[in-house]
């Protein structure tokens, strides 16, 4: 043996021993799933600790080539150890360039390379020793069904997993035309494949999460906006019901007006997209073949042009009522009690509409106070309620106008915020909560009835039942504006900006939240995790209940809900009840009646309505005058 070889021997031996010891010291980083082994990574958290993250685990075969627009197939097994140390590609989607470089926009844009090979999920696990039977919380991102990615910083699951000792899971799913383009009767483009992506990820959780220390019988799905609507859609869909235990819906429900379309409207939009990209010939098969051969960006560039009108809070390719995933329309299923019987926690933010006003409503901008003229207000109402006829628009204007001060720019601005938020988020969610609570009460009164009575279908293909003996509803209003928010003050507590508190970002000192905001975030994480564990946000891990004021159940009669902010908890009754009566009851009836009248009668009713509004305004002014101090005799 050469002298140089002898000198190298200790180095080689030391290297071997180091790697061998390191591998033996970190068995928690490698998990054997049903599909194959995955290797994760340690991520730091405050308190000088860490979580173990498995990032970018494939759950489906890539939906590329001929698989575009089709339901994804489950991932095939692999032999080698899969490196799950970085987030995967983001799914192809629209990228918002309205305010380039502005953090309030960029935080929602994809932060990974976009690809159609994007069906991956992530798992965050509390540190060793390896846990067992931990509660699992599965996040579904929002983004109007046209955008979103599980890799966004605001969805980082490490803080929630570490603080509450739960297993956090998130998944990518296809969005836009890739996830929701639909042609009735076509197996090549059946629609709702983005929802089926989510379901496939939930099936992966059922089959594999116990390898990571999670309990497959204790899975709560939660999401925001379109993600919350998706959560609600799984609550409705019979084949999804066995795959989770409870549900949390943040600022979204399946019955909201932007969340679904009919098959006829879906076909119209698909055909329109084909024309826009040059696929104008042949039958359905040829149309889909042509669309499959287009570069993804070509489809994205034309996506917004398929909408039937210029509007606010409407999106091009969304879930379709197909008779399969949805046996009926969400409204019909909710009204008949045809949904999973379990516990739900849901709520809204104070200013749900303000974000969407920046995308087309005249006079609105992030760079000024957006004081809105009466003319711009009336034009914005038309965009905000695109399905309404003139009589319906007049009803909305009447409800939201302060007739003592109708030209006040601030009041017009805030009224538009309320119109968009009430119609698209708050009032559909209130209706969902009331219907759910009503059927929960009926079911409690008829607990001796056979399973499935009153439409409470827990059973799916496996007959799995959540194990809780009762349903319950908990409702919140999030009304804290973060101290470091980049958006202007007039936008208030914006749609989507409770998420950072749910995921614990205020625990990260470098992000410059206040101490009070860190406490609020810890409180919200505790509520969410308590609910996921027990079905009650008040019940802690050890079975104790918080000594402070408790979060009451929501009932259809009292409609109790809590405010979530940095102040001590307060309980309120009724969530914008008067305004929601317009959207949930009066306006649908009004449009149903007036849509069938001829133009002459319609014009007469419009003029009569305007006259009534004028008389109401005149009476208000007269009453105001009458209350003033009268002139004294000279």
From Swiss-Prot:
BP term (GO), one: cellular response to methanol
Keywords: Cell membrane, Disulfide bond, Glycoprotein, Hydrolase, Membrane, Neurotransmitter degradation, Secreted, Serine esterase, Signal, Synapse
E.C. code: 3.1.1.7
Residue numbers annotated as active site: 225, 352, 495
Keyword Transmembrane helix carried by entry: no
Matches recorded under PROSITE patterns: CARBOXYLESTERASE_B_1, CARBOXYLESTERASE_B_2
Disulfide linkage: 91-118, 279-290, 427-580
Enzyme class, broadest EC rank: hydrolase
Gene3D superfamilies for this protein: alpha/beta hydrolase
Reaction catalysed by this enzyme: acetylcholine + H2O = choline + acetate + H(+)
Pfam families: AChE_tetra, COesterase
PANTHER family: ACETYLCHOLINESTERASE
Entry similarity comment: Belongs to the type-B carboxylesterase/lipase family.
Extra remark beyond the main annotation: No other isoforms exist. This protein corresponds to the T isoform in other species.
Task of the protein: Terminates signal transduction at the neuromuscular junction by rapid hydrolysis of the acetylcholine released into the synaptic cleft.
Protein name per Swiss-Prot or TrEMBL: Acetylcholinesterase
């Amino acid at each position: 043996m050469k002298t140089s070889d002898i000198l190298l021997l200790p180095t080689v031996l030391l290297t071997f021993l180091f790697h061998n010891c390191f591998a033996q010291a970190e068995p928690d980083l490698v998990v054997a799933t049903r599909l194959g082994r995955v290797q994760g990574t340690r991520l730091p958290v405050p308190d000088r600790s860490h979580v173990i993250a498995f990032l970018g685990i494939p759950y489906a075969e890539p939906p590329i080539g001929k698989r575009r627009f089709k339901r994804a197939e489950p991932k095939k097994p692999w032999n080698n150890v899969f490196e799950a140390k970085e987030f995967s590609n983001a799914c192809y989607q629209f990228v918002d360039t309205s305010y380039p470089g502005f953090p309030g926009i960029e935080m929602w844009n994809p932060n990974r390379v976009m690809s159609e090979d994007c069906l991956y999920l992530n798992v965050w696990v509390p540190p060793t020793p390896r846990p067992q039977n931990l509660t699992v919380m599965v996040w579904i991102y929002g983004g109007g069904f046209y955008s979103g990615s599980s890799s966004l910083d605001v969805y980082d699951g490490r803080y929630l997993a570490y603080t509450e000792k739960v297993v956090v899971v998130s998944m990518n799913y296809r969005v836009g035309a890739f996830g929701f383009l639909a042609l009735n009767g076509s197996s090549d483009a059946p629609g709702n494949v983005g929802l089926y992506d989510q379901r496939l990820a939930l099936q992966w959780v059922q089959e594999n999460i116990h390898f990571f220390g999670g309990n497959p019988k204790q899975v709560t799905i939660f999401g925001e906006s379109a993600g919350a609507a998706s959560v609600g859609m799984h609550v409705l869909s019979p084949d999804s019901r066995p795959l989770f235990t409870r549900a949390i819906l943040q600022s979204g429900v399946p019955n909201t007006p932007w969340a679904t379309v009919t098959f006829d409207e879906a076909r119209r939009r698909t055909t329109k997209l084909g024309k826009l990209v040059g696929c104008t010939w042949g039958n359905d098969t040829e149309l889909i073949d042509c669309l499959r051969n287009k570069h993804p960006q070509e489809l994205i560039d034309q996506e917004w042009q398929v909408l039937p009108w210029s509007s606010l809070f409407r999106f091009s390719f969304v879930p379709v009522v197909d008779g399969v995933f949805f046996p009926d329309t969400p409204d019909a299923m909710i009204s008949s009690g045809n949904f999973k019987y379990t516990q739900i926690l849901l709520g809204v933010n104070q200013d749900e509409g303000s974000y969407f006003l920046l995308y087309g409503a005249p006079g609105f901008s992030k760079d000024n106070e957006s004081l809105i003229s009466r003319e711009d207000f009336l034009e914005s109402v038309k965009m905000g309620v695109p399905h309404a006829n003139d009589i319906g628009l007049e009803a909305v204007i009447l409800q939201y106008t302060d007739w003592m001060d109708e030209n006040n720019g601030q009041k017009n601005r805030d009224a538009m915020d309320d119109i968009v938020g009430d119609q698209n988020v708050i009032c559909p969610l209130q209706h969902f909560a009331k219907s759910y609570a009503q059927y929960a009460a009926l079911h409690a009164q008829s607990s001796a009835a056979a399973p499935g009575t009153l439409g409470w279908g827990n059973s799916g293909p496996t007959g799995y039942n959540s194990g809780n003996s009762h349903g319950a509803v908990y409702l919140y209003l999030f009304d804290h504006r973060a101290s470091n928010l980049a958006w202007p003050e007039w936008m208030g507590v914006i749609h989507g900006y409770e998420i950072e508190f749910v995921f614990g970002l205020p625990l990260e000192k470098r992000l410059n939240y206040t101490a009070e905001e860190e406490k609020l975030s810890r409180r919200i994480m505790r509520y969410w995790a308590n609910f996921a564990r027990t079905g009650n946000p008040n019940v802690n891990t050890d079975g104790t209940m918080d000594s402070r004021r408790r979060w009451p159940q929501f009932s259809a009669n009292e409609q109790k809900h809590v405010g979530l902010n940095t102040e001590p908890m307060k309980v309120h009754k009724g969530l914008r009840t008067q305004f929601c009566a317009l959207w949930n009851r009066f306006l649908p009836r009004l449009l149903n009646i007036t849509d069938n009248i001829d133009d002459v009668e319609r014009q007469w009713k419009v003029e009569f309505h305007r006259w009534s509004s004028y008389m109401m305004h005149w009476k208000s002014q007269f009453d105001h005058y009458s209350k003033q101090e009268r002139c004294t005799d000279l």
